């Protein structure tokens, strides 16, 4: 049974730890991200036999409160022979699905796999700080239809990937502020070539309009 469209399988092949999976509504980001999780845990996505992982790590899915409450993710799990209910799962791993509002509950989790859905890691608030801490001790990916409008939107993900130590380093290397502004206001970015290369390294585009 074919579980993925060709464009989804291509995206899985391009994905890596710390990437942003980009796709619009209906592209199947949830299913594709779970396929990547299975692949990272030893599953053969090309086999004609049922998907089977080898001692999969615990899975945490951080999503919107609406998606958590409507059980949208729960509907995707059985396709990969998984369940958040241990009695219904063929694996011994733990699956947790929760909202961004509760992300601080998982700040001390280690050696697990995180899927951050409808990513909210922009700015420097509590969600971002917790996300960066989680990223240091776990494997993770982000799902987003709109990954970033400006270069500063990418700062948390760049830090989580180890490209920069902190926001200050990013600003020192890439941001020029307006000189006579009453408050910090960005005038322009410098060394943009490096930013473009880093963004290309983490973005995985899945344009379902191109599927064949």
Regions found by a protein language model. Give the residues of each.
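Conserved Walker A/P-loop ATP-binding site and its immediately adjacent core
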Residues: 30-37, 45-79, 148-153
């Amino acid at each position: 049974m074919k579980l993925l469209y060709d464009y989804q399988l291509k995206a899985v092949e391009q994905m890596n730890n710390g990437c942003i999976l980009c796709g619009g509504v209906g592209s199947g980001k949830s299913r594709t991200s779970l396929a990547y999780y299975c692949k990272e845990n030893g599953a053969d996505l090309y086999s004609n036999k049922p998907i089977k992982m080898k001692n999969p790590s615990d899975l945490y899915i951080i999503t919107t409160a609406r998606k958590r409450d409507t059980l949208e993710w729960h509907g995707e799990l059985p396709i990969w022979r998984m369940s958040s209910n241990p009695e219904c799962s063929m694996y011994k791993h733990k699956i947790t699905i929760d909202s961004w509002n509760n992300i601080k509950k998982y700040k001390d989790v280690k050696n697990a796999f995180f899927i951050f859905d409808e990513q909210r890691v922009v700015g420097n608030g509590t969600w971002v700080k917790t996300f960066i801490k989680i990223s240091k001790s776990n494997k993770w990916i982000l799902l987003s239809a709109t990954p970033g409008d400006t270069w500063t939107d990418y700062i948390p993900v760049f830090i989580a990937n180890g490209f920069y130590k902190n926001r200050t380093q990013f600003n020192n290397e890439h941001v020029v502020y307006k000189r006579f502004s009453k408050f910090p206001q960005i005038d322009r970015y410098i060394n943009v070539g490096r930013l473009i290369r880093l963004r290309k390294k983490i973005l995985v585009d899945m344009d379902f309009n191109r599927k064949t």
